Amino acid sequence: MAAKEVKFGRSAREKMLRGVDILADAVKVTLGPKGRNVVIDKSFGAPRITKDGVTVAKEIELEDKFENMGAQMVREVASKTNDIAGDGTTTATVLAQAIVREGAKAVAAGMNPMDLKRGIDLAVAEVVKDLLAKAKKINTSDEVAQVGTISANGEKQIGLDIAEAMQKVGNEGVITVEEAKTAETELEVVEGMQFDRGYLSPYFVTNPEKMVADLEDAFILLHEKKLSNLQAMLPVLEAVVQTGKPLLIIAEDVEGEALATLVVNKLRGGLKIAAVKAPGFGDRRKAMLEDIAILTGGTVISEDLGIKLESVTLDMLGRAKKVSITKENTTIVDGAGQKSDIEGRVAQIKAQIEETTSDYDREKLQERLAKLAGGVAVIRVGGATEVEVKEKKDRIDDALNATRAAVQEGIVPGGGVALLRSSVKITVKGENDDQDAGVNIVRRALQSPARQIVENAGDEASIVVGKILEKNTDDFGYNAQTGEYGDMIAMGIIDPVKVVRTALQDAASVASLLITTEAMIAELPKKDAPAMPGGMGGMGGMDMM
């Protein structure tokens, strides 16, 4: 085991505070409409330019182990806020720095760190209650666009694209952001459920120009295993032929004789049919087949359930108004599933999302949720250079997350004003003076985001904050973009409550841990082994080549 260095008390906190300051100072320059860019050197390729707080935080690694511990704990604030709310990472970092600074001063003055923490917790709980009470729900597409625009640093088109995407696929729908091959940013919407499996044979194509197989008002057979011969399927195939409707087969695979027979029947015109592989792998494949079954009102033919192919009847097949199959994708539009069944499945997937600890699983569950809940929209981000596209993609990701958060919990005035107003409304009292000091720490820290936004815009923070607090209306604030005072919501400067709330709770949680730290342990830097001495004995007179 390597030797460790241990620091205690004040010297530990000083080192930690220095690390917090280095990281927070780099992140906070990006806050607000006039936030500056941060350029990040990459070991390969062009440097990356970003205004995204969490991206900056993730790049910072300090040489001094103790300073690095402080920096990494604040980085945790940014990334946790990003995971929960998807935005507000810079605000969270600014709040954490303010609480840690004030808290460290109070501890140095001899106050009890645990009481300070209790005071901080009391104040945060009251502020969260206040924020939720004054939240305004958003209903219109214009309000959605406003939230998107703000989070994308004032770029109106991004806000409009996000509003349009959410209108088309619903609030639960999947909206993905990809890099475009062109200079333009565009929006593409796929309605219904789409999965990444195409037709198993080009002979299934119904539109040779576009190489697409379109099936109108189709039956859908969902089979968990491979199909290699059609003998067992003949009864159900004959029943489908009688109806004159097309049939889509989704199975683990359709191969050999089974595929050949289907193709021959299709070419002879007796059977309108197409076959695709089931999406996903392993347990996820089972779950996705079940999703399709619920969406189309069918049953998965599975030996686990004791259903054999020979005994399949028409009422076990799913139905959909339209199925469109390309070489790569299958889209099922307007499935015949019961609304109540679909809602039940959506609730079940939401519960799994809450419980899972794996980011990958969460992402896959969210994809499944969206496919059930409405559809998929893709925003393709264009730009003149790769650097510009990456920077824009960061902003669109932020804007998208903020918009989702706004739809969930509502909005409050932006520009740091909501927290500023809450700072004046804190009335909670602690059980002793040290707890009251903890409450005051939060009271002062709540002003820091508004101050930072004003400073980044090049104005005098104290004057602006004073002027905002003079007026006793909740929505009155300062537009850092134009330098005007007025009604923040009317000016379209808004923040999602979820983002502000999460930023404050995460910042206070980590800052409290830092304040109550009394010892720090880090590995001593390894001493490099001495270099090999020059020239070896007994080799005198040899010429070196």
Swiss-Prot record:
Positions with a binding annotation for ATP: 30-33, 51, 87-91, 415, 495
**What are its E.C. numbers?**
5.6.1.7
EC main class here is isomerase
Nucleotide-binding found in the keyword field: yes
Gene Ontology terms for molecular function: ATP binding; ATP-dependent protein folding chaperone; isomerase activity; unfolded protein binding
Q: Which GO terms describe its cellular component?
A: cytoplasm
Alphabetically sorted, this entry's keywords are: ATP-binding, Chaperone, Cytoplasm, Isomerase, Nucleotide-binding, Plasmid, Stress response
A Pfam family recorded for this sequence: Cpn60_TCP1
| Cell location | Cytoplasm
Keyword Nucleotide-binding recorded: yes
For this protein, the record's Gene3D superfamilies field holds: GroEL, GroEL-like equatorial domain, TCP-1-like chaperonin intermediate domain
Instruction: Name its GO BP terms in alphabetical order.
Output: protein refolding
Quote the SUPFAM superfamilies the UniProt record gives: GroEL apical domain-like (SSF52029), GroEL equatorial domain-like (SSF48592), GroEL-intermediate domain like (SSF54849)
Checking InterPro entries in the record gives: Chaperonin_Cpn60_CS (IPR018370), Cpn60/GroEL (IPR001844), Cpn60/GroEL/TCP-1 (IPR002423), GroEL-like_apical_dom_sf (IPR027409), GROEL-like_equatorial_sf (IPR027413), TCP-1-like_intermed_sf (IPR027410)
Reaction(s) catalysed by this chain's protein = ATP + H2O + a folded polypeptide = ADP + phosphate + an unfolded polypeptide
Family indicated by similarity: Belongs to the chaperonin (HSP60) family.
Q: Which HAMAP family match?
A: CH60
Q: Tell me, what does this protein do in biology?
A: Together with its co-chaperonin GroES, plays an essential role in assisting protein folding. The GroEL-GroES system forms a nano-cage that allows encapsulation of the non-native substrate proteins and provides a physical environment optimized to promote and accelerate protein folding.
What is annotated about its quaternary structure and interactions? Forms a cylinder of 14 subunits composed of two heptameric rings stacked back-to-back. Interacts with the co-chaperonin GroES.
What is this protein identified as?
Chaperonin GroEL 4
What organism does the UniProt record list as the source?
Rhizobium meliloti (strain 1021)
